[in-house]
């Protein structure tokens, strides 16, 4: 491709709305452009890389035994009502009505559609296992779309669905897809961790997420260096023991604490650590109000709370000031577990029951109570773990110290059991002629997210450093001055030879300054650069690798072979 013909509107300045390096560089490199918030168009260079990610995914899904199909993005409400997800997913679902007032959604995922499709066609255990996948545009009405391709309202996704006759078969399909995902992300040269994840609205069975590690990741990952334990902060089991005081139970005492509404302020007033307090938080869970009491130095894990309450995630919100005042009789900041109004259900993290003579909110503005003890002064429903993991917590597998790092979720896999087959009455006949529900799995890869995650891991101050397998073009041949015959002719000759060998190559024949050409090549991240410049008359070119910034002058007759050596193994 001649760059004089290429549509590549590069930018020198960083767009003000772009926060992450991947978003900045995709815009600056002329690979994407925003239509509206959370909706992007792929330009030629970006689309070439997108198709390469898709092709890697396609090859590995085929290798894992999945078959490609394509389903409708427009889905009827009735299917989602049958599984209970029309209400559960909440405002993130893009909903619409046709001219006959029938309700639809633009699919964020396709469990309902694929189950409805298969149940009408697949009748016997002899047709199992089956795994179908598609690569398709999905929709999610993000409250705050940001970070470019990382959190958008329209995104391209590979979603696969497996059908098996029993749990053993489902687990085998799950394992096969896990291995397929590892091959996908290995070929994309991503540094990633496989972590336990929360299934959320997908179901309550086992799930794992593939996290590309990045300081800009939206997810927090807890992991252990001493064993293979790794989980999202939403899923991580918190091993945290309260040090019990070696003292008797003291008499409670109400203390005047004016304008002392935070744990930090309380620690200063009482001159003690945060673990001497019990923190009580109030939530609105649908139409109910719930209170949660936890150690003062910890945070509530809202995902664990949602799962325990068995409600859609969007229904859990922090209680409003008006609600707090109604159920505690106090302003925000003074809630405690004692004497809450009858309508409030109190849940207590189990660690609280071991804490002695602690300070709690008095449910009275500007007052706290000290020397409070669970069992004597208040009771609630004890819950084993309602805490959010913190750095330094102990690994639930081996007991060593956990570390926290950030990651970008690029893939996920779920064991769905019979959630969707039961909801949609999808059955087959087993060996004994008896009707059974399908055991299912669901498997997603964010295509655009993977592309952005690669940039997060492979870039510098000059631009992108694409791995060879994903680069929009593998080589750029730069003619420094097209007006000089020896440079133009040598560049054209090398370009033609590379094309004849099937190399994906750009020829920078633009009438731009050398600086512009070099900066553009570095910005768009072409892995190999061949420069026909001042020494072209002596049959000498510059050979440069973007990954290492290594440059050297070589004989022009050798450069094609050098390029082919770099491309071996692709």
Swiss-Prot record:
Chief subcellular location equals: cytoplasm
Gene Ontology BP annotations: prolyl-tRNA aminoacylation
Q: Which UniProt keywords apply?
A: Aminoacyl-tRNA synthetase, ATP-binding, Cytoplasm, Ligase, Nucleotide-binding, Protein biosynthesis
Q: Does the keyword Ligase apply?
A: yes
Under InterPro entries, the record lists:
aa-tRNA-synt_IIb, aa-tRNA-synth_II, aa-tRNA-synth_II/BPL/LPL, Anticodon-bd, Anticodon-bd_dom_sf, Pro-tRNA-ligase_IIa, Pro-tRNA-synth_IIa_bac-type, Pro-tRNA-Synthase_IIa_type1
Query: Could you say which EC number(s) this protein's record lists?
Result: 6.1.1.15
Q: Which SUPFAM superfamilies does the annotation name?
A: Class II aaRS ABD-related, Class II aaRS and biotin synthetases, YbaK/ProRS associated domain
The source's superkingdom equals: Bacteria
* Location(s), subcellular: Cytoplasm
Q: Which GO terms describe its molecular function?
A: aminoacyl-tRNA deacylase activity; ATP binding; catalytic activity, acting on a protein; proline-tRNA ligase activity; transferase activity
Q: Which Gene3D superfamilies match?
A: Anticodon-binding domain (3.40.50.800), Bira Bifunctional Protein, Domain 2 (3.30.930.10)
Instruction: Write down the PROSITE patterns for this protein, in alphabetical order.
Output: AA_TRNA_LIGASE_II
Catalyzed reactions: tRNA(Pro) + L-proline + ATP = L-prolyl-tRNA(Pro) + AMP + diphosphate
GO cellular component, as recorded: cytosol
Quaternary structure and interacting proteins, as annotated: Homodimer.
Q: Which family does it belong to?
A: Belongs to the class-II aminoacyl-tRNA synthetase family. ProS type 1 subfamily.
User: What does UniProt say about this protein's domains?
Assistant: Consists of three domains: the N-terminal catalytic domain, the editing domain and the C-terminal anticodon-binding domain.
Name the job this protein performs. Catalyzes the attachment of proline to tRNA(Pro) in a two-step reaction: proline is first activated by ATP to form Pro-AMP and then transferred to the acceptor end of tRNA(Pro). As ProRS can inadvertently accommodate and process non-cognate amino acids such as alanine and cysteine, to avoid such errors it has two additional distinct editing activities against alanine. One activity is designated as 'pretransfer' editing and involves the tRNA(Pro)-independent hydrolysis of activated Ala-AMP.
Specify the protein name.
Answer: Proline--tRNA ligase
At the highest ranks, the source species' classification is: Bacteria, Bacillati, Bacillota, Clostridia, Peptostreptococcales
Tell me the gene name.
Answer: proS
């Amino acid at each position: 491709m001649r760059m004089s013909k290429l549509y590549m509107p590069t930018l020198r300045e960083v767009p003000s709305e772009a926060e992450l390096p991947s978003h900045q560089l995709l815009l600056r490199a002329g690979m994407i452009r925003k239509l509206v918030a959370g909706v992007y168009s792929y330009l030629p260079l970006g689309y070439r890389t997108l198709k390469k990610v898709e092709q890697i995914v396609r090859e590995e899904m085929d290798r894992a035994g999945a078959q490609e199909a394509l389903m409708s993005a427009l889905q009827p409400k009735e299917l989602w009502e049958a599984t209970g997800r029309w209400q559960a997913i909440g405002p993130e679902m893009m909903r619409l009505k046709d001219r006959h007032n029938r309700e639809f959604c633009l699919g964020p995922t396709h469990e309902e559609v694929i189950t409805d499709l298969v149940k009408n066609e697949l009748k016997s255990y002899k047709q199992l296992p089956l795994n179908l996948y598609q690569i398709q545009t999905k929709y999610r009405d993000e409250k705050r779309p940001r970070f470019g391709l990382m959190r958008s309202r329209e995104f391209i996704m590979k979603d696969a669905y497996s059908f098996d006759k029993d749990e053993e078969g489902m687990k085998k399909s799950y394992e096969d897809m896990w291995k397929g995902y590892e091959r996908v992300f290995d070929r994309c040269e991503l540094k990633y961790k496989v972590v336990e994840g929360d299934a959320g609205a997908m179901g309550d069975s086992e799930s794992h997420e593939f996290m590309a590690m990045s300081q800009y990741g939206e997810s927090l990952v807890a992991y252990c260096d001493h064993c293979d334990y790794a989980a999202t902060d939403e899923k991580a089991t918190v091993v945290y023991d309260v040090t019990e005081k070696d003292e008797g139970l003291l008499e409670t005492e109400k203390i005047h604490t004016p304008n002392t509404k935070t744990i930090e302020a309380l620690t200063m007033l009482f001159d003690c650590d945060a673990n001497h307090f019990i923190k009580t938080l109030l939530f609105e869970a649908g139409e109910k109000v719930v209170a949660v009491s936890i150690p003062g130095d910890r945070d509530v894990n809202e995902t664990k709370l949602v799962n325990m309450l068995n409600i859609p995630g969007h229904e859990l919100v922090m209680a409003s000031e008006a609600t707090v005042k109604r159920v505690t009789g106090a302003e925000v900041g003074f809630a405690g577990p004692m004497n809450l109004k009858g309508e409030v259900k109190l849940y207590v993290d189990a660690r609280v029951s071991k804490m002695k003579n602690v300070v709690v909110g008095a449910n009275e503005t500007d007052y706290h109570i000290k020397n409070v003890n669970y069992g004597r002064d208040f009771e609630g429903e004890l819950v084993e773990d309602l805490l959010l993991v913190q750095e330094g917590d102990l690994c639930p597998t081996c007991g060593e110290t956990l570390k926290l790092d950030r990651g970008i979720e690029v893939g996920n896999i779920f064991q769905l059991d019979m959630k969707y087959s039961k909801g949609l009455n999808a059955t087959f006949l087993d060996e004994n002629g008896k009707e059974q529900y399908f055991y299912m799995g669901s498997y997603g890869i964010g295509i655009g997210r993977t592309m952005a995650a690669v940039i997060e891991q492979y870039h510098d101050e000059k631009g992108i450093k694409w791995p060879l397998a994903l680069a929009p073009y593998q080589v750029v041949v730069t003619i420094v001055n097209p007006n000089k015959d020896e440079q133009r002719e040598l560049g054209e000759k090398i370009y033609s030879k590379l094309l004849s060998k099937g190399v994906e190559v750009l020829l920078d024949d633009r009438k731009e300054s050398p600086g512009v050409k070099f900066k553009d090549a570095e910005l768009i991240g072409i892995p190999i650069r061949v420069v026909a410049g001042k020494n072209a008359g002596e049959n000498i070119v510059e050979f440069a690798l973007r990954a290492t910034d290594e440059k050297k002058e070589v004989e022009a007759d050798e450069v094609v072979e050098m390029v082919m050596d770099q491309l071996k193994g692709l």
